[in-house]
Amino acid sequence: VDITPEFNPLRIPSDRRLNRIAGPSSLIIFGVTGDLSRKKLMPAVYDLANRGLLPPGFALIGFARRDWEDQDFEQVVYEAVKQYSRTKFDEDVWRQLAQGIRFVQGTFDDDEAFQTLKDITEELDRERGTMGNHAFYLSIPPKSFPLVTEQLRRSGLADQKEGHWRRVVIEKPFGSDLTTARELNAVVESVFPPDSVFRIDHYLGKETVQNILALRFANQLYEPLWNANYVDHVQITMAEDIGVGGRAGYYDGIGAARDVIQNHLLQLLALTAMEEPVAFDASSLRDEKEKVLSAVRLPKDLSTATARGQYAGGWQGGEEVVGFLDEDGMDPESLTETYAAMRLDINTRRWSGVPFYLRAGKRLGRRVTEIAVVFKRAPQNLFAEDQTSALGQNALVIRVQPDEGVTIRFGSKVPGAGMQVRDVTMDFGYGHAFTEASPEAYERLILDVLLGDPPLFPRHQEVELSWKILDPIEEFWRTQGQPEQYRPGTWGPASADELLARDGRTWRRP
């Protein structure tokens, strides 16, 4: 096969059997001294290189205020890779990667630093063969986006020439409400065209989240049941067993709903509830997700359809932990919630009358993220009531983390002479079923940015629709005073249990 600049069989978008390899390019990280960069981004870049998915001439550039030289930054990357990378360390791979590591010292308002950055990218184009293809990763607070994007425009770094690309990657939060999300989007898209803007939601890079599409649409088994005729309700849970810790300053004023429900959980809802797209491409996937999000309706009485809480101090896992209001740097009068739950309805024929319950919180019973599709009970004409008294509702549970996989719960006869039906589970785990190791979410997403492959990245319409759902709830909560306290290690405040009890349901115990 002849490989030319126009044709490379390892980069054919329609062939998804093999991992495609990124073309000549560089990744420029702003906020390179932060935790995300050290624990996720740098190790992910190394893991991609180790798997042979980065080109030989790839370059990694850090931009920060630290008074570092290239070799200082190289040492920082080295230590991050040794500590956090998923794949085994290989000296040859590291040596090849390290040749392309550069550092630019400066602040975001320093014109000279951005000119230096431009000079370095041009030097890398010549020496490393990055060919004018550069991705800017903004791992920085949203308030800095306008300044950095304007500097990229003014310095000419954002200019795209024919046959080359420039892309920008934005980390959540995408604003704090609909108004700020629109302002943020206008700022970024005034410099970069919409198809060059990649909004990172790392949950969408997780293997199980992408498997929702395969589970639903590659199989005949589930889709006929995936509707209001058979589904009783859906529960989407994101629980953490830790507190806010060192993020107290960031977390205060944001809370559980803005932090994870607006992005992660509403994306999971959209993938669970959407119709089958006409093609497995970015535009078709996004169209269907947007249709679902635009069909979401809030119940009229938010006092009975939402719940929120703050974790108190107490004992969890054999150790004493402080309450949210006593965390270092926390305002003792804070009204920010660490637990949020809500009922949402979807106004489509498929989901008419099926409530979607979303919950997220910190200092809960265990760390778990899952989607539980709970089915209606079968008519019990055949069995006596005492024969099925131990039988719950059938459920299909998609575990996003930890132990990625799928569980199906159904009734089976208990061994013995009598007829007793009890719940059993069938369990599929990624770690057991496949010899291939799942890539870390950021590996997949960084590679997709370098390939220009956008299906896993929400566009600004999705972000705005998510805020339209959440904003009325946040406005209502602002009138409700102090959130309810809940004990650490439990599953949230009593009001969350009451939310489901009003509908005759209970939360699953993950």
What kind of region is each of these model predictions?
Residues 1-170, 174-510:
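Secretory/organelle targeting and membrane-embedding segments
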